[in-house]
Amino acid sequence: MSNQSKKGKLFLALLVPVCILNACTSTGKKPGNADSSKKEETRKVQYLSEPLISSIYTADPSAHVFAGKIYIYPSHDIDAGIPENDNGDHFAMKDYHILSMDSIGGKVTDHGVGFDIKDIPWAGRQLWAPDAAYKNGTYYLYFPVKDKKDVFRIGVATSTNPAGPFKADSEPIAGSYSIDPAVFTDTDGKTYMYFGGIWGGQLQRWITGKYDANGSKTDSKQEDAPAINCKVALLKPDMKNFDGKVKDVLIVDSLGKPLLTKDHNRRFFEGSWMHKYNGKYYFTYSTGDTHFLCYAVSSSPLGPFTYKGVFMKPVQGWTTHHSIVEIKGRWFIFYHDTQLSGKTHLRNIKVTQLQHNADGSIKLIDPFLQD
């Protein structure tokens, strides 16, 4: 789930679009020409991909293949009239619309509301980025939402249908906190949940193991210390509880040293995902306020993960919450931007191909077409 920063606002301001056919135009003042600032310059922005759906605003797409069909579990963005802030209060989502498609490029079906915040007994506000999984005839929907004390927890809901409706458990997952659950089932049948996000995701307020309501609003504030890590927990066979302690997802550089708090171009911020390719585990994530999607690789789903680089350049809008899935032997990344609205809290989901190079690296993706 995205937060809003001054850098994000500046980035968006440079690219606010008005959609025209399959391209867009944005207007802005000419740099370094204050005397003629009233004259607006129009330039064309061409996008790599088009929105998958335009009838509603969607973001944070978690895509999976269930029973041969592609199902997408996105956030459902709404305009709640709440002023933007770095805490992300303007992301006031209340339900999930579950989408499906038979193939990439095919018709997208909106199955309507599959889950609503009013059906979560312990929920307060802000139903953010979900994920889903399947096991033994049951579909599991994992969701972050603030409880009645305004603390993010992660809950689970179940259904016999991938499109829902889903029924929430009466309590959040014990030991869970923060946002952005991403659930990965390995080839040995073990299932892991990766989760967490700093700033509005509150991960920095759990440094001591207990929630600090008066803690930092951003990160650890220790610039030369190791950055706050994403978290991972093994799930029990019931898919509803953690099996053991929550662990750090350690990201290290080529020398094996942890990435530091001040390393905003590489350190973890939010929006993690896990996929396995040629026996290696690819931990992908957003750097948040610098807008990159990065990846780190390990021989274990628990890490440590060695940072490898950026695999997607910044999109229009704020951070890029994504998912990566293999479909009929090809890999795709689902992501979002703000092409339809030009507003950071009203986003639209997209998809494009993701390619692994022969050496295992991921080919860099530019979300814009260059002239």
Task: Put a short name on every predicted segment.
Residues 10-18:
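Sec-dependent N-terminal signal peptides
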